[in-house]
Amino acid sequence: MEAYAMHKMAIVAPRKARMTLDLIRGKSVKDARAILNNTNTKSSRLILKVLNSATANAVNNLNLKEEELFVSECFINPGPVLKRIKFGSRTKVDRRDKRTSHITVKVSDGKEA
């Protein structure tokens, strides 16, 4: 059975967060937590929260054992871009794009329903 969790509108660039997400794909939940705890990036902290939420959903809602869970699927979709302005010298104005992401993590025990 499979449980999932999502974090929408996370203010982190999808391209940067995908590099962290590739580290945990297919790993057990215990190993994925260890990897994310030792990775010093903003995206790893956000992904760890989503992983903990997906694990709690599996344990509490589906009565699965935490020791048997692994990360079956995880992906990041780009969210809306927040457009901001940056003032430069000599009255120049540039546009800064703050990219957002939608993070999804699915955990499974490998058994069908």
What are the language-model segments listed below?
Residues V29, E66, L82, T91-D94:
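Short, flexible micro-motifs
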Residues F75-G88:
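A short, conserved strand-capping beta-turn/loop at the end of a beta strand
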Residues M1-I76, K98-A113:
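Ribosome large-subunit tunnel/peptidyl-transferase-proximal elements
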Residues I85-K86, T91-H102:
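C-terminal structural segments of small proteins and small subunits
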